[in-house]
From Swiss-Prot:
<comment type="subunit">
    <text>Part of the 30S ribosomal subunit.</text>
</comment>
<comment type="similarity">
    <text>Belongs to the universal ribosomal protein uS10 family.</text>
</comment>
<dbReference type="Pfam" id="PF00338">
    <property type="entry name" value="Ribosomal_S10"/>
</dbReference>
<dbReference type="GO" id="GO:0003735">
    <property type="term" value="F:structural constituent of ribosome"/>
</dbReference>
<keyword id="KW-0689">Ribosomal protein</keyword>
<dbReference type="InterPro" id="IPR036838">
    <property type="entry name" value="Ribosomal_uS10_dom_sf"/>
</dbReference>
<dbReference type="GO" id="GO:0000049">
    <property type="term" value="F:tRNA binding"/>
</dbReference>
<dbReference type="GO" id="GO:1990904">
    <property type="term" value="C:ribonucleoprotein complex"/>
</dbReference>
<dbReference type="GO" id="GO:0006412">
    <property type="term" value="P:translation"/>
</dbReference>
<dbReference type="GO" id="GO:0005840">
    <property type="term" value="C:ribosome"/>
</dbReference>
<dbReference type="InterPro" id="IPR018268">
    <property type="entry name" value="Ribosomal_uS10_CS"/>
</dbReference>
<protein>
    <recommendedName>
        <fullName>Small ribosomal subunit protein uS10</fullName>
    </recommendedName>
</protein>
<dbReference type="InterPro" id="IPR027486">
    <property type="entry name" value="Ribosomal_uS10_dom"/>
</dbReference>
<keyword id="KW-0687">Ribonucleoprotein</keyword>
<comment type="function">
    <text>Involved in the binding of tRNA to the ribosomes.</text>
</comment>
<dbReference type="InterPro" id="IPR001848">
    <property type="entry name" value="Ribosomal_uS10"/>
</dbReference>
Amino acid sequence: MATQKIRIRLKAYDYKLLDQSAGEIVETAKRTGAKVAGPIPLPTRINKFTVLRSPHVDKKSREQFEIRTHKRLLDILEPTPQTLDALMKLDLSAGVDVEIK
């Protein structure tokens, strides 16, 4: 017998917002009777940008900026129809990208 599984991947720049959203999803899934594996922290992607400080001269003087993209993975095992309805109605924060597989 094949079991159904919902895999949810969350991405955000702010890890506090990400953990809060993951907690809401876990709480909703457990309340409706599904089993939850996670949240599993995935590697943080760091994009670094180097720019010149001066617009004209002084090439040696540079400034670095970085953007950190935090990721979490959630597996919802054996979801019920109530779980699907509750997850569809769930309103998460604006800064969190949700990808469902």
